[in-house]
A protein has these predicted regions:
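Active-site beta-loop-alpha junctions enriched in small/polar residues
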Residues: 19-21, 44-46, 74-76, 102-104, ...
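Glycine-rich, positively charged N-terminal anion/phosphate-binding segment
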Residues: 1-10, 19-95
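Alpha/beta enzyme core
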Residues: 82-113, 117, 121-199
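Alpha/beta catalytic cores of nucleotide-metabolism and tRNA/nucleoside-modifying enzymes
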Residues: 1-15, 20, 25-26, 139, ...
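Conserved beta-strand positions in the central sheet of alpha/beta enzyme cores
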Residues: 39-40, 70-72, 98, 141, ...
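Short, solvent-exposed helix-helix connector turns and helix-capping sites enriched
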Residues: 52-53, 120-121, 234, 276
Length: 356
């Protein structure tokens, strides 16, 4: 494997997948604290950057403690993509630029962006070459899906093209655009991509446990993994994966109190950033639904989360939930992990504190 990216040297990096509306600065920092090695911003429209849209620029904000961090751009105009990449480098100096060739969302695909370029390899190649040349020597990476649909799976060919354009590493999501997020990720194709190029390939898709990560690492030649939906409900999954990679033992989820502390921290910081608490917390409802998946009495919590509009309400729900059998939110003791010495060992292995 050849790479100019130092985080691959003698390591198996864990990426946090870029997810629109999810991987903002606050959530990225939470995941970093729990062991994510490499972060990527929410995808940013190259046209928005090119036209110096101030809202677009807000998506680029990050702290030095998040490094290594890449800014992900999407678009289909090579000249505009190149200029946008140059502007991003001038504005925020990321560690790399990432190109989105995998987004399945209709409004992106309709403009020939995201996964639409898997059907238009000449434009995909032109975009990649233009951006690589525009920001050299800064590394440029890319993310793709395995193809447009089941009849046009071309990930290996696309990977070869991107490698030839100077792309430094490639993340591959194991579904087609037509699948969206349904069905199963095809790790056979991801493995073929990893075999077919010399740049690092990062596997992505259906990685919901440490055991699954180790299985995919063993079965393929991937150089790292990218965690998406699993992190939305359990940002501590990065710590669990690292512990399992080092020790071969499973690390339980954090205590219930720690999980609630993460949720409340996220809500408080989000409200502070927005300035309007009620709007901020309403915008967090979908995120709270995701967090509830790893909490006892998830259904009852989701019903409560649908109506919250202040941090105080969330704190009250947390207090009730942790206290025991009140208001129908009785924690199921069989699903709560007891205090475990392995958590202390994990912090030693990973050299970080989840409460830092």
């Amino acid at each position: 494997m050849f790479t100019t990216l130092p985080w691959f040297n003698a390591a198996f990096p864990l990426y946090l997948a870029p997810m629109a509306g999810v991987t903002d600065k606050i959530f990225r920092q939470i995941c970093k604290r729990y062991g994510a090695d490499v972060l990527v911003t929410e995808f940013v429209s190259a046209e928005g950057v090119f036209r110096r849209n101030e809202r677009t620029r807000e998506y680029l904000d990050f702290a030095d403690g998040e490094r290594p961090l890449g800014v992900q751009l999407f678009g289909a105009n090579p000249a505009h993509m190149a200029e946008a990449a140059r502007q991003v480098v001038d504005w925020v100096a990321p560690d790399f630029i990432d190109l989105n060739f995998g987004c399945p969302v209709n409004k992106v695909v309709a403009k020939n962006g995201g996964s639409a370029l898997l059907k238009d390899c000449p434009t995909l190649s032109s975009v990649a070459k233009a951006v690589v040349q525009a920001v050299a020597p800064l590394p440029v990476t890319a993310k793709i899906r395995i193809g447009w649909d089941a009849n046009s799976i071309n990930a290996v060919r696309v990977a070869e093209i991107l490698q030839g354009c100077g792309i430094a590493a490639l993340a591959v999501h194991g579904r087609t655009r037509a699948q969206g997020y349904s069905g199963e990720a095809d790790w056979r194709v991801i493995g073929e991509v990893a075999e077919g190029v010399t740049i690092p390939v990062i596997g992505n898709g259906d990685l919901f446990s440490a055991q699954e990560v180790v299985r995919r690492r063993t079965e393929t030649k991937i150089a790292g993994v990218m965690i998406g939906r699993a992190a939305m409900s359990a940002p501590w999954i990065f710590r669990q994966i690292k512990y399992y990679l080092v020790t071969g033992e499973l690390l339980p989820a954090p205590e219930l109190s720690e999980r609630w502390n993460v949720i409340i921290e996220h809500c408080r910081r989000h409200a502070a950033d927005w300035g309007d608490e009620e709007q901020a917390i309403r915008s967090m409802r979908a995120r709270l639904m995701a967090y509830s998946k790893n909490l006892p009495e998830a259904k009852a919590l989701r019903e409560r989360f649908q109506h919250v509009s202040t941090v105080g309400e969330i704190e009250d729900i947390a207090e009730t939930h942790q206290a025991g059998p009140k208001e129908g939110l009785r924690p199921n003791a069989s699903r709560l992990e007891p205090a475990d010495t392995r958590r202390t060992a994990a912090r030693s292995v990973l050299n970080f504190s989840p409460t830092a």
